[in-house]
C-alpha cells in the first residue's frame, strides 16, 4: 500500500495494525509486486487502475504484472476498466474478481468454517473470491498457492462474470440491510419498534438476527455502499432490463446514513453510536427529521 495514497489516517492506522508494509509511491508498489489486488471504494476503481498503469509506464520492464480488480462494480464498469488497461499496451494481465463474505479472521482451534480446507490456511475464515477472465495465474511460480490461500475460484473465462456475481450477491445482503434500516427507523418513529422485533422474532427469527447484525455494522461502510447500490442498479438494468429505481432507492438510504451527523462519523474499530439496531433506528430517525425540518 503506497504511503502517499490519499487514504484516511484511519485506513493507514488499520494497515499498520495488520502489519501491511507502506510504500512511498505507486511506482515502488509496482516495482515490488507481481500481483496487485485492487480493493477500494467502487467510485475509485477506475482511477486506481489508471494509477497502476501510469506507474508501470514509468518503469523500464517487460515483467508481467497481474492486476486483480476486486471492486464492487457492474460488469460494464469492470469491462471498461479492463479495456483501458489493455489500451495501455503494458505487460499487465487483468483479472476480474469479487469478494463474497466477511473479512478474513482467525478461527478457534479445530473450528469448521465454510472456507476450511486441507491446506495450512484452514485455521482461518476466508471469504470466497470468485475470479473470471482469460488470464489465470499459471505463469507465476506461486500461482497455485496464491489461488488456494486467497480461496479463489475461477468461474468464467469472461471479464465481468465475477463482478456480476458480486452484484447479484450484494443485492440480497446489502439490499436487505437497506430495507431493514428503513423498516426499523419507521417503526421507531411509530413507537412500535419493540413490537416489530417481537413479531419478526416469532415468525422470522433468522431475519431478525440478520438485521440485528447487519444494520449496526453498516454505518461506517455506508459511504462506500452508495456507489455499490448504483452499480447494482446499473447491472440489473443492463443485464436483465430491470428498472433502476429499487437499488437507486437503496443508494439513497446509504447516502442518508453517510450524511447523518451522528452515524456518518462512525469508523470501523472506533464505534460510538449505532452499535445496536435500536440506536441506528433512533439516530437515523433524528437525522431524517432534521433533514425534513424547514430551515
Give a label for each model feature.
Residues 257-295:
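NAD(P)-dependent dehydrogenase/reductase Rossmann-like domain
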Residues 18, 79, 83, 243-246, ...:
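Metal- and O2-centered redox machinery and metal/ROS homeostasis
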Residues 1-20, 24-28, 190:
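NAD(P)-binding Rossmann-fold cofactor-contacting core
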Residues 8-11, 45, 49, 78, ...:
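A general structural signal for well-ordered alpha-helical segments in protein cores
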Residues 162-273:
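Helical "substrate-binding/catalytic lid" subdomain
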Residues 26-97:
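Rossmann-fold NAD(P) dinucleotide-binding segment
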Residues 73-174:
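Rossmann-fold dinucleotide-binding core
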Residues 19, 32-33, 149-150:
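Short, well-ordered alpha-helix to beta-strand connector turns
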